[in-house]
Amino acid sequence: GLVGSEMCIRDSLVGVSFASASQITLSHTDRSNPDSFHAERRSLLNKYAGFAKRHFNSTGQHLDIVDLHYADKQKRASGKTPLRYNTYWTGSILVGSPPQAAPVVFDTGSSDLILDKSFYNPKKSLSANNLNTPFDFSYINLHVYGDIYSDHVAIGDVKADNVPIGHGREDFDGDLAGGKFGLSFSTAENSGFDVKQDPFIWAAKKQNPIQSSSFQFTLRRSGKATLNVGDVDHSELAGPISWADENTDKTFWRTSVELNGNKIENAIVDSGTNVITGPNDQVKAVLDQLDGVWVEQSPDGTYQGRYSCQNPPNLHFTVAGQTFKLSSDAINFGYAGDKCFLAMGGTLGLNDWILGSPFMELGSVIFNYDTRRMGFAKAR
């Protein structure tokens, strides 16, 4: 069958000197405390407001993911955004010659590779090339600016040359690991880079015989969490892959899902966000239907679920015809006493659902750039 032939092709390439696919391990820090859910919402609004502004500036059209007036008003009213606790899934990449190791957040909700100056020094890389192009934009709570270089980049054994890298002039203050590796589609609307060089996955595809332009996330709290690049590792899977329809969004990875029977259309799958969120009233409607969940309203009007830690609710997503139950670890955003906080809440000013990393813990999630489709399978 197809699975066997794919494995056969992959296995036959193992002994060859180039890497057709590679796997790295991802790590995850402990869950944040409940207070940081507010910071998470704000970070997410800032992130997508930044995209919306760039989209408008480059196309003259409005990106309807967020209400820009609301996002700007929130930013002005609050001054400094509370720091998010670093609870991302991160992995290490190698940059430059000789290679410099940098921990990064792999972010399917953005498109550029930006590195903290503490982890990448282009002056120490023989292969770095200054593209003489500055970058300057907002990303989550950060004002990110600096110069764009091109250099060698490797994820495990899959390498690419002349990959554009934003070299930040300041450190990221703990709001990101050492940088962020954007994995959404690179378009003028969502990229902060005005350069012609290909992002990593396209450069790797052109320069190496990788099996497919794909990333496969298998996020496990217990056991090894992995990111496979360049092919699907079927040994990670405990069942068939269900493929979602072709993604027609030019910029973001989107899919329609059902959450406990509630239809959610065209949600953005964003591994760089730590929660599942959406329009405030829509999220409340879903929370109201979950057995064992108390719906709490914050002073700012947003809703979040709370539950007894001894009796976590059953959250299940149906995507591409297959149903996945989220683990009790995935749905837990922190606790106070014997009450746990659900990693799902509403966000005012947000018009679309954002399915963050808790959603991606449902099993193995594949992002295939060649077909513009996402695949979902249960993990071993």
What are these regions (language model features)?
Residues 20-57, 170-171, 314-380:
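Aspartic protease catalytic domain
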